Structures are given as structure tokens and as C-alpha cells.
């Protein structure tokens, strides 16, 4: 059975257009680079690494260090819960859509982080970024009806490979379009990471 055709831009919600995701994944890449380069050498745009590091510390018997990783994971969980709870109440008022309100909130949140002193514990920024990255990941889920992530690139790599094979095997133009869309997301994530690294040097 053929996959449904990807909708044209004019038929999509603004928050589902590809350019929105291009901006959001650049922000997601910046989050990871920011906390890794400037705030303690950890990635806060996703949680896989935190659980791996927690397991490593448990294996070494460092219980205190292991338990620390529950803090960013809990912040990430809280961000998901809130971003599931709020949209229904905000959209019901029909003043502004949740995704629009979230972008304004995210900008204010990151702006406020800029006032955290350089000598403050890095955990403050780590937890704050975990929280907001989780909300972003949960709020922006698809572009042009293609499931996408805006804070990490693992799925984008898988989708590039999968759609490349579909395109080469059958000449499917839709698969080719999806492949290039995911490839664009990877490039933007890498570019924002590299830009943050150079700015911090």
C-alpha cells in the first residue's frame, strides 16, 4: 500500500512547516553544544547519555554520582508532562495556539538563562535546558506530516538510510523528499553545534 502523499505547505499548520523545524532543530543543536562546551561537559538535549552515564557510575559503585543523573532525567520528564498538560487548556481559549505560546516561553526561558552568573553551579543551566528541550521535543513532532525530532539526530540518521534505500530500490520520489528533509535536519543540528563551539572559544 502506497504511503499517503506529503501535504503541500499551504495545507499544513504553520508549526508543521519544514522551515519551522529547521529553526527548532538548530536550537536543539545549540542546546547540546551549549551544555557540553560551557556547562559541565554533558548533553542536555536528550537523555540517553545520562542513563548510560548513570549505569557506568553504578557499575563503579559511585552511588552519589549515579543518583545525580536522576535530576536531569526528572527535569526532562517534568517538561514532557507539562507540555502534554498545557496545550489543551491554552488551545481551548482560542487566543493563541500552544506551539506559538511555547516558542515565546522558550525564548524568555533561554534569555533568562543568560543572566545566570558564570561562576554559578553548571547544574542550574543543565536542568533548565533539560526541561525546555523536553518541552520542545514533545511540542514539535512532525514536519509535512513526517515524524521528526528537533533535539537530537539519531532518528534522522535512520530515516536518511531507510528512505535512501526506498528511493534507490523503487525510484519513490516521496522517499527521496523525506531523505533530503531528514538530511537537512542533520546538517542544521551539526551547524548549530559547530557554531556554538566556535563562539565559546
Predicted feature locations:
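Helix-to-loop junctions at the C-terminal end of transmembrane segments
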Residues: 82-92
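Hydrophobic core of transmembrane alpha-helices in multi-pass small-molecule transporters
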Residues: 26, 122-147
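Single conserved hydrophobic/aromatic residue that forms the stacking wall/gate
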Residues: 190-201
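C-terminal ends and interior cores of transmembrane alpha-helices
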Residues: 109-118
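Cytoplasmic-side transmembrane-helix entry/capping segments in multi-pass membrane proteins
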Residues: 96-103
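Short, Lys/Arg-rich, polar N-terminal cytosolic tail immediately upstream
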Residues: 1-14
